[in-house]
Amino acid sequence: MSYRMSRSRVFGALGAAGLLALPACSSGTHPPAAVTTSAPAASAGTTSPAAPVTSVRIGRFTQEFATPLPADQAQAKIIEGWREAQILWSKSLIAWRLVPGVTGYVTGVARTHLLGAISYGKQNDAVPAGADRMFMTSVTSVAPTAATITTCDDGSRFAEVNPKTGTVNQAFATPADHQYLYETWHMVPVGGHWAIGSFTLATLPAAAARHCQP
């Protein structure tokens, strides 16, 4: 889930809103994302040992998409919009501002949460670092004006650091029962592509989160 601020902070804020819902290292600038594809080492939760992983490097943070795009072109376009939204979300957290293009891919309630995450990160000198892996990702419903994506999210290597020093802030460490999440992303068409409109998440002990655990 690349919705980032401190995960525990996200859970608290979204829980208070009745959602338990989500997402997506230097102030003012953001380097271009480096996209690579490689075969992952065998690890818990991967759909197949040979499944390629698309990795997007953004500053100190790496977003991994472990599930290949679906063969169905309509579904692939939905996933592509979701991936772009995740990347722009993370870039915005690193830049502490909405970066160009993000408002076209993150809208509605999701954008409200992104703005809150940006504000929180700036106030606490924290930006995403480490890595986050989305796996078992699929389009579960499609309609002309809405689509739904579900995914598992491995945040076991995710951290938050001070962008000036690179020091990991242990106060924002992710609790063990929040490292592997089950997420539902509600997508809407915007300007010829798909964008994130809202999202929800499940953590242990919720049944939905159990199949995402290592």
Positions of PLM-derived features:
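Short, low-complexity, Pro/Ser/Thr/Gly-rich segments in the mature regions of secreted, periplasmic
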Residues: R57, F61, P205-P214
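C-terminal motif of bacterial Sec signal peptides marking the signal peptidase cleavage site
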Residues: A21-A24
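Core segments of small alpha/beta cavity-forming domains
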Residues: V53-G130
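Extracellular mucin-like PTS domains
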Residues: P32-S55
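Bacterial signal peptide processing site
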Residues: S26-T29
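Bacterial N-terminal signal peptides that target proteins for export
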Residues: S2-G15
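Structured, amphipathic secondary-structure segments that form assembly/contact surfaces
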Residues: R97-H211
